[in-house]
Amino acid sequence: MAQKDSETADQRSVIKVAWTAHKGTGPETGSDVEKFMKQLMPHDPFMMTDQQPDIILFMSGGSEMKAISMIQSGHPVLLVSINGNNAYAAATEVMAWTVNNNIFAMLSDAAEASETGLIDRWCQAVRVWKSLQGRKAGLVGSVSDWLVASDVPAERFLELFNVTLEKIPWNSLQDYSDQEPDASLLNRFNRDTAAGLVEAAKVLTLLRKLAEKNGLNAIAVECFSLVQQREVTACLALAQLNNEGIVAACEGDLASMAGMMLLKVATGSVPWLANTTGTNGNRLLLSHCTVAFDLVSDIKLATHFETDLSLALNGTITASDVTVFRFSGGLDRAFIAEGRVTGHPSLSNACRTQVEIELPQQSLALLRSRPLGNHLLMAPGKYAELLHLVCAYKAIKVI
C-alpha cells in the first residue's frame, strides 16, 4: 500500500495521548496518568506524547495554557478530565478555546467517556482517518455521464482522505480477452458453464492485475462502455474484489468509492453499492448487481438488467440490521441512517439483487427532498453513531 509518510500501519493504529496539569505537579504524575489511561483504554494501544495528541487528559486546574500549546489547527482532540481538582473546569475553558478557533473537539469527564463508549468511538474515528492516509485509488475510464452529482475532484480526495486518485483510460489497458480467467471466480461457481462466466473471469484478472501493478486500494470502473461495446459485464469481477476487501465501485462512481473506502475501514467489510430503486411509506428499496458474495445467500447468475447481456449477481441479503450511507459529490456532506431489512423482492424491472429496508421517516424524507445521489451504500450492522463521529471529525455535515 502506498504511504505518504514514514508512519507504518501499526503506528497509525496507536492513539496519541497527552496530559496537562498545573506547574506545581509532582514528577510522579506522568506514571499516574499512564496507569489511569490503561484503565480507560484497556484494548486500545496508545503512546504518551505532547505532539499532535488525539486525547488530552486534564489532571487539574491551571493547566489550560499547556493544553492549548499542544493543540494544532486541523487536528481534532478529545478533552477528558479526572474528577475534581478543577480539572473539568480547565477542560471546559480549553473546549471554549477550540470552538473560538474552529478546531473540532469533544469534552467529557474521563470516567463517563469510558462508560458511554465515547473513548472507544473516538479511537475508532481517529484510526479510520489515519488508516486512509496514503492510500491510492483508481478511476478506470470516466465517471458515467448520468452520475451528475457523483464526480469528486482528485484534489478533494487528497485534501480530505490524503488519498491519491489516478485516472486510467480503458484504452491504456490490455484487452480483457487476452487474460487468463480468474480461477477464484470460476471455482466459486464450480466452473459453471453459464454463458459469459469465463469472460467475466477474464475481466476480473485484468482488474486484479491493474490494482496490483498500480498499488490501488480501491477502483471505480466505468463498466457500461465494456458491456455496450464488448457484451461482457464487470459485475461479477467487482463483486469478487469487494468480497476480498478490495473496494470496487461500478459506473465510475467516485463519491460511492470514497464512501466504500470509509466504511470498509470503519466496519471491516466493503458495503454494497446499490440504486435507490424506490421508496414506499417507511420502506426503501435498493437494487444492484455487484454485491460482495459474503453479504448474500442463494446466489444465482442472471443477465445484466439494463442490457440483458452477460452476467450479473442475484442474491438474498442476509443482514437484518443495516446502516445506509452516502457522501455528496464534494465529500462535504453525508447521509447516515440505520434500518431493518423487511423483504427481499424479485422485481423484473430492477437490478438483480434487491432488498427492502425499513428506515425512520425522517431519513426517508431526506432521501426524497435532499438526496445526495442515486447510489447508496448498505453495510450490515449498526454503525450510525460511529459514522456520525467519523464525519464530525472532518467537519463533514450529516444531513
Locate predicted features:
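Cofactor- and metal-binding active-site motifs of prokaryotic enzymes
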Residues: 2, 25-133, 143-150, 284-288
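Short beta-strand segments enriched in small/hydrophobic residues
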Residues: 4-26, 134-144
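Extended hydrophobic packing segments that form well-structured cores
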Residues: 313-399
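C-terminal catalytic subdomain
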Residues: 246-346
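Conserved, well-structured core segments that form the ligand-binding/active-site neighborhood
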Residues: 96-269
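Structural motif
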Residues: 18, 55-59, 218-220
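Short, glycine-/Ser/Thr-/acidic-enriched flexible segments
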Residues: 22-24, 62-63, 142-145, 224-226, ...
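General beta-strand structural signal in soluble alpha/beta enzymes
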Residues: 48-50, 79, 106-109, 166-168, ...
